[in-house]
Amino acid sequence: MKLMLETGLMFGEEAQLEVTMRELTTGDLLDAEMAAERLVMTPEGEAVLAKSPALFGYELLRRQIASVGKINGPISMRQLRSLTTEDLNRISLYAQSWESAKAEQVVSRGRLDTADQETGKDLSAVS
């Protein structure tokens, strides 16, 4: 899945504008979760791991970027931070709409599976 940025990331003197997105893997999810954890001290002096939901989201997003033009992904957090607000919002909205579309397909398949069980008909060719 591809989208175009307004400002993009610089590669030498050339702005890279075309973003290619990819499916997240289980490894991506685990790596993002670990990257979003920080060791903090409680007032009692105990060390605990704290997870930042916002950081987790950005870690997932940067891993979902397969490339930005000539720049291979996943992009670094530094590169993600260097995006303009508009470009970051564009990527975020695109990723959210892509995930929503995939979720709707799963729900639709579930409806077909349920209809298949109720009618005894093979509806797999419909999807």
From Swiss-Prot:
Pfam family, one: Gp41_Mu
Protein's name according to its UniProt entry: Mu-like prophage FluMu protein gp41
Region (Disordered): 107-127
Bias kind Basic and acidic residues: ranges: 110-121
Source organism: Haemophilus influenzae (strain ATCC 51907 / DSM 11121 / KW20 / Rd)
Domain of life: Bacteria
Family: To phage Mu protein gp41.
InterPro entries: Tail_Gp41-like
